[in-house]
Amino acid sequence: MSRENGAALDFTINIDATADLDLDTHHAEALITVQSSPGGTSAPAGRIAEVLIMDRSLSMKGQRKINEARRAARAAIDALPEGALLAIIAGNERAVCVFPPVQGLARIDAEVREAAKHAVSGLMPEGGTKIGQWLAEASGLFLADPTAATVRHVVLYTDGKNEHESAAELGSTLDACADQFICDVRGLGDDWDHVQLRHIAGKLHGDAEAVLRIEDLAGDFTRLMRRVQLIAVPRTYLRLAPNDAFRITAVTQAYPVEVDMTQHQRPGGGTVIDVPLGSWEERETRRYQVSLRFDPAAVPTGEKLRAVRVDLLAEVANGTRVPCANAPVTVFRHATPGDPTTIPESITQVHDQREIGLAIRACVDAWLNGRNADADAELDVALRLARKSRDPRLPLLEDIAESGPDGKVRVRGALTPGEMKKLGLDSFKTALPSSHRPPARPEDQPAGQPPDDVDKAGERAAGPAMPMAAGQACGICGEQNEPGSAHCVECGNRLRGRGVA
């Protein structure tokens, strides 16, 4: 479709849904699989605008950290193509643009490249950490090139916690920056906040990773600069237009990284919502889970009904959003009591993967807060769930596990906080079914991480629909939820039932 609409990629949408609904149920789910392929116009997209944010707070002093950070920044500068736009921010409790010397972005040529590398060489650590201030400064710099086709990208690293601004202040900045640029974030060493970095990356459509060895930062930055050059469409949107009888209660990116996108949605007119999806490369696959609620009295029985129209929109060079693909979410409500709702295997897998991630994060949180018995118990749950479903995160769990004197699983000794925080970030990573999972690209696969099959993925899972068993009631609002649900569809409360055999 790209030849007609001006987008650089073609997109396809496939949908699995809880299509056969129990007469008494009042909610449904859909799993939307979006795939990109080379389109009619040449990729990549327009020029790149890159902002490097360097943490220069006092905690960067010692252990060669500031020297390696300078080396990483120079490597990133060398990896950017001629003609790209560049700025460099040095951040502590203030954000200072150290390059270019005048406000805005500099177009890279040989002279600019050398000047930029010289600018980072004199940075010395001092002061505290105020990440929201850094991101706000980057947002202002991008105003120098508001062209819709420009790929606006930020790389941010930090080795500490955001101690000089409140969570509300950071949240306000993230809301203002959302859909304005992509931000990849990196945590160095042991003292950063993995929950905070995952939140930043999720809000700004980037990746959050741990760099445990500071000397690996330069290679990581080089990979990021090469990756940004592969972006073909800078901004895309999932438009969800529900039938009048339905309302959307939650939207979650389910693959390749789990991200709650419910708060990302923007009004699209009437009951329609647009969910920003960020940028796309060729041959990417992503999955989005949509939760729906309806009044049974408003949905007829015995006939197929379109619950939601799904459109994928891409922003093209003139700034308009053009439709690239669409598909319906259809449901069928049984007329006879006792006919069970059926759940496609692909949706069951999403629930299973989410439960594993929740158990891993509970383990990490307990360990970091000194609750070792709780950490051991959550690790045991995560291991059993991962083994049962052959989850790709299983090797990561086995790497931190050992048997105690009583024969029970426990978190092994000699782990560092950085290693556990890395596991916390990796817990959000999910996979396609193994039968459709291609090998990762070697240059994009950091050591010790789950398979990254973002770039080349096959068809969606096509398993048989599974009957829904008795649900579990939410302890907060009393809502009955499907088995395997991680959160209540009505109030969002975490459901603790795991049902491990």
Question: Can you name each region flagged by the protein language model?
Answer:
Residues 22, 39-41, 97, 247-249, ...:
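Intrinsically disordered, low-complexity acidic/polar segments
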Residues 23, 281-283, 481:
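Surface-exposed coil/turn segments at beta-strand junctions on protein surfaces, enriched
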Residues 3-235, 297, 391:
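Exposed acidic/Ser/Thr-rich ligand/metal-binding surfaces
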